[in-house]
From Swiss-Prot:
Species the sequence originates in: Endomicrobium trichonymphae
Subunit structure, as described in the record: Homodimer. Probably interacts with PlsY.
Organism phylogeny: Bacteria, Pseudomonadati, Elusimicrobiota, Endomicrobiia, Endomicrobiales
Highest taxon above the source species: Bacteria
Family as reported in the entry's similarity comment: Belongs to the PlsX family.
Gene Ontology terms describing biological process: fatty acid biosynthetic process; phospholipid biosynthetic process
Protein name as it appears in the record: Phosphate acyltransferase
Functional pathway: Lipid metabolism; phospholipid metabolism
Gene that this sequence comes from: plsX
Class of the enzyme per the UniProt entry, highest EC level: transferase
Protein's cellular compartments: Cytoplasm
The UniProt record lists the keyword Lipid biosynthesis: yes
């Protein structure tokens, strides 16, 4: 696979993105197109010449004269900065020169670039950022995670169809359980949006199990959780905060109780495994479902490991040709209800 990486996007770019590209190139056969200001990227790569044989790595620098910052207006920046690293990445996919593009930068701009250059899949109303959230049984897919803070019932319906397909094909979950995030399990619970979406999801050709509450997501009751982007982003950020709090509390308790220190070598293995299960860098990035092509949006504070895994996520998503499956599923539903 050929993956275009927005090397200028992210809080720690280009250091983190170049490091991630090197990690990905060393651990796979994927070709990495490092897109950004050439002079800067060459300088970053040369920092690794003592540790790696750079000539053996399948990395190519694609020059872009501009980049989009985190605080710029997404759509405006994409329209005005046509030679930004992000725009160049999206065009590489649109022109068939890359199988996917990955960005750790301005998520709104990444979505705008995908819509502008890749276009929406026929029949899709709005694309959704579909992220992996750890739970008791393994992982849950949440859609939407922030692309659409205001939604219609029809948007949520399509999020369910797209995320269910992604969960089945890419995450290899057979007949994934799809739940609608609400304030109670009963079908009568919720607001106008969720009540209307509930009725639509019942008619979809997916394994819709009804309403689920926030606690059901980490509890492992569902494989796919559907919500608007406002709720999804709150869930994600709350989960990150709770994880950090729990790990800090564990460290604090150990410091306050010296008698437990003898067990630390044994408990550390469990804590290490726990941290790995909930660490966002293990998942890399979230696919933008609903566009003609593969766009992976990563965390702004991603390190090299997260960038590497986002590249792998892009390659895996591209391998399964999710866009074609989504188009077929949306068309099948539309024909069913006509």
């Amino acid at each position: 696979m050929i993956i275009a990486l927005d090397a200028m996007g992210g809080d720690f770019a280009p250091a983190s993105t170049v490091e991630g590209a090197i990690f990905a190139a060393k651990e796979s056969k994927h070709k990495i197109l490092l897109v950004g200001i050439e002079k800067i990227l060459v300088g970053e790569l040369l920092k690794y010449r003592g540790r790696y044989d750079l000539k053996s790595l399948n990395i190519e620098i694609i020059n872009a004269t501009e980049f989009i910052t985190m605080d710029e207006h997404p759509a405006k920046a994409v329209r005005q900065k046509k030679d930004s690293s992000l725009s160049v990445c999206a065009r590489l996919v649109a022109d068939g020169k890359a199988d996917a593009f990955v960005s750790m930068g301005n998520s709104g701009a990444a979505m705008s670039a995908a819509l502008f250059y890749l276009k929406r899949i026929e029949g899709v109303l709005r694309p959704a950022i579909s992220t992996v959230f750890p739970n008791f049984g393994g992982h849950c897919i949440i859609a939407d995670m922030g692309a659409n803070v205001d939604c219609t019932p029809e948007y949520l319906l399509q999020f369910g169809i797209m995320a269910s397909l992604f969960c089945e094909k890419v995450a290899s979950v057979e007949n994934p359980r799809v739940g609608l995030v609400s304030i109670g399990e009963e079908s009568t619970k919720g607001n106008e949006l969720t009540l209307a979406a509930f009725e639509l999801l019942k008619k979809a050709d997916i394994n819709f199990i009804g309403n689920v509450e926030g606690r059901d997501i980490p509890g492992g009751k569902v494989d796919v959780a559907i919500c608007d982007g406002f709720v999804g982003n709150v869930i994600l950020k709350l989960g990150e905060g709770l994880t950090e709090m729990m790990l800090k509390l564990i460290r604090k308790e150990f410091k306050q109780h010296p008698m437990t220190w003898a067990s630390l070598p044994f408990l550390w293995l469990a804590i290490k495994d726990l941290r790995k299960r909930v660490d966002y860098s293990e998942f890399g990035g979230a696919p933008l479902l609903g566009v003609e092509g593969v766009c992976i949006i990563g965390h702004g504070s991603s390190n090299g490991k997260a960038v590497k895994n986002a590249i792998f996520a892009g390659a895996e998503t591209a391998k399964h040709n999710i866009a074609a499956g989504i188009k077929e599923a949306i068309l099948r539903y539309n024909n069913k209800v006509v």
